[in-house]
Swiss-Prot record:
It comes from the Bacteria. This is UPF0237 protein BL1209.1. Transmembrane segments: none annotated. Belongs to the UPF0237 family. Residues 5-79 form the ACT domain. PANTHER family: UPF0237 PROTEIN MJ1558. InterPro entries: ACT-like_dom_sf, ACT_dom, UPF0237/GcvR_regulator, UPF0237_ACT. HAMAP family: UPF0237. PROSITE patterns: ACT.
Length: 90
């Protein structure tokens, strides 16, 4: 299993989750967990995904997700799980 953490932050609008999940499913990336909240009109989502069977390499997927975020009007970041864990350790 190759896990990654995807974060999405920005103004809430219709279809954010749908657009991100559609991209992931089209490229055979499995969503393992998802947490989403909206606070005062700001959308925040964190996903744990498995990209072991993805049809794109990790770097291409990261770039595509950033471009998708630009299209939607949110910021999308994707990091390998081990990098995310090391960066957020206290």
């Amino acid at each position: 299993m190759n896990k990654a953490i995807i974060t999405v932050v920005g103004q809430d609008t219709v279809g954010i989750i749908a657009r991100v999940c559609t991209y992931l499913s089209q490229h055979n990336v499995n969503v393992l967990d998802i947490s989403q909240t909206i606070i005062d009109g700001y959308f925040n989502m964190m996903m744990i995904v498995d990209y072991a069977n993805a049809d794109k390499d990790f770097g291409a997927m990261v770039g595509n997700l950033e471009d998708l975020g630009d299209d939607i009007g949110v910021r999308i970041r994707c990091q390998r799980e081990e990098i995310f864990t090391k960066m957020h350790r206290i």
